[in-house]
Amino acid sequence: MAERDLNEYLAKIAKAKVNRRSFLAASGLLGGSAALAACTSGSGNSAAPSAAASAGGAPSTPAPASAAPSAAAIENELFIYNWSDYIAPENISAFEAMHNTTITYDIFANNEELLAKLQGGASGYDLACPTAEFLVPMVEEGFIEKLDQSRLPNMKHIDPALLGQKWDPNNEYHVPKDYGTTGILVRKKVVTEPVTSWREFYDLAVGKYSGRVVMVDSLGDVLIMPLKMLGYSLNETDPAKLDESRKILTDLAPHILALDSDTYQDKLASEEAVLCLGWTGPLLELRENPETADTEYVVPSEGTLFWLDTWVKLADAPHPNAAYEWLNWIHDPEVQAKETEFNGYATPNLEAKKLVSQALLDDPAIFPPDDVIASLEGADPAVTDDEGRLALWADFKSAIG
């Protein structure tokens, strides 16, 4: 993504009023055999982190030291609440070995679940990875703390185009993690018809490939499809336009295999599902396997969502020094490049980008070209708690079962 185009795009979406919350999802990633052993507890676990676990395997190359190690003692535990399989296992292993620290990695399926868990009194976590627009309600509700920038020298590597945005205008509360889009994954050896738009996705889902369609479990991503099919903004709240979207989703619901943010790549690999509304994360693993190398990722012609995921330090984090050390170390360029190679999402770290393979840099699914950038739309934080959208989502989920 050219810096000029990213600046222009972010300037455009930053004009949206920021006052409540919006959903921009990013998950999926590598599944099955590549899943982190550190993920010892799932999205439905108790409020506090569970027993500590670590990812197996040593890093293939020596991990670089943190650019500015904290003078304070680094605690021997670190609790992370994150999307599934969203950290390179070798980086977890390296951090644990460097600091004799055990990382516990609990997962959530979407931003709504993360926020609800914190609202329900969850405590004991040090770090979490909300999508950018969720910074606003998390700050308002006191769930995250301002960061001491003197302890984060590696922030100098972050693309300035991603900083100073409405969700955190003074860059006080977050460290950018990854960015990407929401689109369609297609098993082309099964689906021979063209899939270039949300309309074509819908027609195939309710027709020939009924029952073999999976969608990520996230309101803000799923609503993109009917709204863009109808020519509306993905932030639409007008009741009449939402009713039009409701009709589309009501007709679609009987044909959906599952709402699944964590293992949809496994369903694609087995051909249980051959169409998916999701993210680019699983694409690398699927393409590397000869049996699933036919998997393609499509940014629909009607347009779709741009999202940015972030690192935040939670209020009253029990292991603050380990948290700061992680936040800085993860953006050492060598470490960050391993993240991109593992998870298949675009890095905001300009120096790390120089170390990423040319194949990834040239992949339009991961680093979108200019024409795709022009079609993207950011989510308005004001719409997430819109009652009409929430009711529509609840009805759709109930219809799927």
Annotate each PLM feature.
Residues M1-V18, L29-L36:
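N-terminal secretory signal peptides
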Residues T40-P49:
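Bacterial lipoprotein signal-peptidase II cleavage site
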Residues A67, A71-P137:
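Early extracytoplasmic/lumenal segment of secretory-pathway proteins
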Residues Y81, Y86-P89, A128-E272:
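Extracytoplasmic ligand-binding site segments that recognize negatively charged/polar headgroups
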Residues L185-V190, K228-G231, W307-A322, L327, ...:
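A bilobed periplasmic-binding-protein/Venus flytrap-type ligand-binding module shared by bacterial periplasmic
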Residues L242-D251, L257, E291-A315:
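Periplasmic-binding protein-like
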Residues D266, D370-G401:
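Conserved C-terminal helix/tail region of periplasmic/extracytoplasmic solute-binding proteins
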Residues L314-A374:
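Mature extracytoplasmic/periplasmic domains
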